Amino acid sequence: MVTRTRPVAAMAVRSRSSSRTGTAYLLLVLCEVSWAQIFSFPFRRPETCDFNQYFDISALSCAPCGANQRRDALGTSCVCLPGYHMISNNGGPSIICKKCPENMKGVTKDGWDCISCPSGLTAEGKCHCPTGHILVERNVSGSLLAQATCELCDESENSFTKANALGTRCVRCEPTFVNTSRSCSCSEPHTLTGGLCFSNTGNFHQRVISTARYGELGMSLNSEWFAKYLQATAAACWTHANLTSCQALGNMCVMNMNSYDSTTLDACRLFHYIFESTAGLISVHSVPFWRQNLPWLFYGDQPGLAPQVLSTTPLPTNFSFKGQNQLKFVAASYDIRGNFIKWQPLEGGVLQLCPDTERRLDAAYAFGTTYQQNCEISLSKLLVDFSSPVFYDVYLEYTDEEQHRYLWPIPVLNLNLQHNKLFVNQDSSSSKWLLTRRIFLVDAVSGRENDLGNQPRVIRVATQISLSIRLVPNTKNGNIYTPLLTIAYSDIDIKNAHSQSAKISFSVKYEMNQGDASVHTDIALGVLGGLAVLSSLLKTAGWKRRVGSPMIDLQTVMKFLLYYAGDLANVFFIITVGTGLYWLIFFKAQKSVSVLLPMPVQEERFVTYVGCAFAMKALQFLHKFISQISIDIFFIDWERPKGKVLKAVEGEGGVRSATVPVSIWRTYFVANEWNEIQTVRKINPLFQVLTTLFFLEVVGFKNLALMDSSSSLSRNPSDYTAPYSRILRYAVATAIWLVIGIIQVVFFAAFYERFIEDKIRQFVDLCSMSNVSVFLLSHRCFGYYIHGRSVHGHADTNMEEMNMNLKREAENLCSQRGLVPNTDGQTFQIAVSSQMRQHYDRIHETLTRRNGPARLLSSSGSTFEQSIKAYHAMNKFLGSFIDHVHKEMDYFIKDKLLLERILGMEFMEPMEKSIFYNDEGHSFSSVLYYGNEATLLIFDLLFFCVVDLACQDFVLASFLTYLQQEIFRFIRNTVGQKNLATKTLVDERFLI
């Protein structure tokens, strides 16, 4: 029966359970009970529980203790009240207490039994014994005595024992008591200090200064730690050569910043006294500054010793950028009492107060990686994490050829060290430095007054730690000198530890002697600068000939300076690009280290060169920019009226006949095309900027500018990112910019102009088809001529005749387009005579007497007619000049000499006749953007680099570079258009 009913009962239980679950769920849904109300509970701390409550670590709340119980010292369990002993204890609060009988009111130390006490009870209900006695509750076999006894420890010479601090057993007296007084007491004439007993007959210093000095705050305070332990520690070190005491004395000296004052008997003075007094002892590991039994704190105070330590002996090992390149720094660590803690590697952030991932912290010791870490830490955290300072002696571990492991000590430059009240380590001359050995990170002990349990009044923090690694000059195998650990401490007067903080920095920097590089740069600058002077003189001489001025005046000097600025800009550009690429290639590609990057301070000279290059290139750009928007230009219309076609014109004398005028639309069309090609370039500026930005930011070429040994373009986000080198950023940016620019120019010249569109040659062809020539004067007596005279005689014709003319020209059924018969030369450089220029100016003055082009509807008739007359006069004069009509202002055509082409100047002066030089290279583009692409490309590049050097942001540099390109292009178009309208009488409203 039982077995049959079990399934039914189980089903009933499951049914009732399901019903209850469904009901509960339905109630939750219908009542919309808040989950926050279900899962929230009161917040309790152990210290908030009552005297008879304990903190339940499971329920995280206060719970009552049992009868005759109270909470323990931790607050997480219960103990019996005084006068009660335990009869059951299952752990935690699960205890049962029972009252002791009247004749046995005391409770044993373990709390399980009651006992009769010989001399009173403590507040906890335990037996109490007088000073020097120990409490005995059990016999030798462990049986509980009926009454406890207080036994006096035997202090006689046979035992030398006394009660321990807990009063539970007799222990041997402290050795200094026994050795000094042959007893367990230290009375006159002996001295008791720091729990040790010393004899006055040792003639050791008695007036020890326990003051802790804080130079940054300009204050001193009486350190409880020094007052309590300094004299005892020094005496134990001096008298007994106690190793731990000597280490503790050294720690106290380090806590006082290794400062030494011959007039003050402080920790360092005591250490020096002991060091000098033990000169007869042997040196440790043959190091003259490391005396037996003493810690190695100083390298000595001889002048000039620091440079010998740092720059005389290279480390007997090599370093490379490939393979295992970690610097193995290790430290011997000691606690404040002088106990040796352990050997520990510096990996894991031992000396780095700023928190970070272990991977990033360990990157500080990757050889060749410049490391920089900064943070701000609250004083409350420092007080918790560094309640007691830890002291470190730092070494570099290396192996010899036989794989034997050795240690190389790392000297310390403590910037807070004072020698006879002088901060010698802050001097710029290393010969005055005093190197030390031991460091700590945080000292929150020496700043405590009166009681070591109090919060310190002052805390001393190592806020700046810098590890400097210097490469041996001319090394090929990665040899380095002894690294230098520079440390600076900040003294902080604690007001509110929770609101105060300390700014911490940790850095590793690499350096090498940059003297040779500076000399080579100076030589290159001197040689190229001299060549720039010669080039500028030649350009100035060529300019003087082109303006027809034989005198050297202020304008000549200013012109020379402008040319020199441009040439010197190229010199600085070449030097900076060469220098940048040198560091980029040789630093990143080396395996065995032979060069290291210049430090940020050493980069200032390079940045100055870049700034000079940009400033002078900007001056050259503005010079050319202004020259282009102020050129003299005129369109010569060769078109003549066809036959004697007449038309009726109404005048004052009635209706009369007149010749049909030549259409002006061809001239307007040519003027518009000229206006369009003024800012045509051989590259696409937007493509240039975006492509450069793409390679730098997206592909990751900017990672080559990081100051580490890696040449990878992609970096793991979890890895440490080294700071950027400004030299490498400049090198990478210039290399990418120039490569993209050169590729664009080559593509434009070799493909685009040849197969798609060549706007410069198209303009020359347009002039021929329009029967319009272009006369340009970029200087007073020098300019360019584009011969556009139609070989068909007329260009103002219909479509049929135009196509017929093109067909005849394609089939060579007409003469060639050149100025000289049977030639194709249409473009010329021209050097005009002064007489011709004067005649041009007389006509031009009439042409430009008005402030602007004629406003067709609003200008007065007389002004308009004068302009028309001047226009026709100029057109007639230039046309007749080209046709050799004026024998007194004639010209001849010749080829330029090779040397003239190379130097960019003319040897012959146009004295009586003007000179037309054949120009197949269309050099008239020099008055356009097109012919100054190199200047524009370098100016844009330098602008890009200067912005990046200032902001360290390629995106911002790209945006501002494109913005300035567009601004100058707009100004060039606008002002150039106005100049074109003014010089050619083409109404600006028709320039679209």
UniProtKB/Swiss-Prot annotation:
Intramembrane region spans per record: 668-676, 677-685, 686-698, 729-754, 755-759, 760-768, 924-926, 927-933, 934-949
**What are the disulfide bonds?**
49-62, 65-78, 80-97, 100-114, 117-127, 129-150, 153-170, 173-184, 186-197, 237-246, 253-268, 354-375
- Which Gene Ontology cellular component terms are annotated? cytoplasmic vesicle membrane; cytoskeleton; endoplasmic reticulum membrane; MKS complex; plasma membrane
Which SUPFAM superfamilies does UniProt cross-reference here? Growth factor receptor domain
Q: Keywords assigned by UniProt?
A: Cell membrane, Cell projection, Cilium, Cilium biogenesis/degradation, Cytoplasm, Cytoskeleton, Disulfide bond, Endoplasmic reticulum, Glycoprotein, Membrane, Signal, Transmembrane, Transmembrane helix
Q: How does it sit in the bilayer?
A: Multi-pass membrane protein
Tell me where the transmembrane regions lie: 517-545, 556-587, 601-628, 668-698, 729-768, 924-949, 955-982
Subcellular location, record wording: Cell membrane; Endoplasmic reticulum membrane; Cytoplasm, Cytoskeleton, Cilium basal body
Query: Signal peptide position in this chain?
Result: 1-36
List, in alphabetical order, the GO biological process terms annotated in this UniProt record: branching morphogenesis of an epithelial tube; cilium assembly; determination of left/right symmetry; epithelial tube branching involved in lung morphogenesis; heart development; kidney development; negative regulation of centrosome duplication; non-canonical Wnt signaling pathway
What phenotype has been reported when the gene encoding this protein is knocked out?
Knockout mice die soon after birth. They show multi-organ developmental abnormalities including pulmonary hypoplasia, ventricular septal defects, shortening of the body longitudinal axis, limb abnormalities, and cochlear hair cell stereociliary bundle orientation and basal body/kinocilium positioning defects.
Keyword Disulfide bond applies: yes
Q: Where is this region: Cysteine-rich?
A: 37-280
Cytoplasmic compartment: which residues?
Answer: 546-555, 629-667, 769-923, 983-992
Q: Name one Pfam family in it.
A: Meckelin
Which residues are sugar-modified?
Answer: 242
- Topology feature Extracellular, residues: 37-516, 588-600, 699-728, 950-954
Q: Which disease is it linked to?
A: A spontaneous deletion of TMEM67 cause the bilateral polycystic kidneys (bpck) phenotype, a disease mimicking human Meckel-Gruber syndrome 3. Homozygous bpck/bpck mice typically manifest bilateral nephropathy with swollen abdomens resulting from grossly enlarged polycystic kidneys and die by 3 week of age. Some mice also develop hydrocephalus, usually detectable within a few days of birth. Additionally, bpck/bpck mice exhibit retinal degeneration and tissue disorganization in the eye, and cochlear defects.
In UniProt terms, what function does this protein have?
Answer: Part of the tectonic-like complex which is required for tissue-specific ciliogenesis and may regulate ciliary membrane composition. Involved in centrosome migration to the apical cell surface during early ciliogenesis. Required for ciliary structure and function, including a role in regulating length and appropriate number through modulating centrosome duplication. Is a key regulator of stereociliary bundle orientation. Required for epithelial cell branching morphology. Essential for endoplasmic reticulum-associated degradation (ERAD) of surfactant protein C (sftpc).
* Subunit: Homodimer. Part of the tectonic-like complex (also named B9 complex). Interacts with DNAJB9, DNAJC10 and mutated SFTPC. Interacts with SYNE2 during the early establishment of cell polarity. Interacts (via C-terminus) with FLNA. Interacts with TMEM218. Interacts with WNT5A. Interacts with ROR2.
Q: What is this protein called?
A: Meckelin
State the organism of origin: Mus musculus
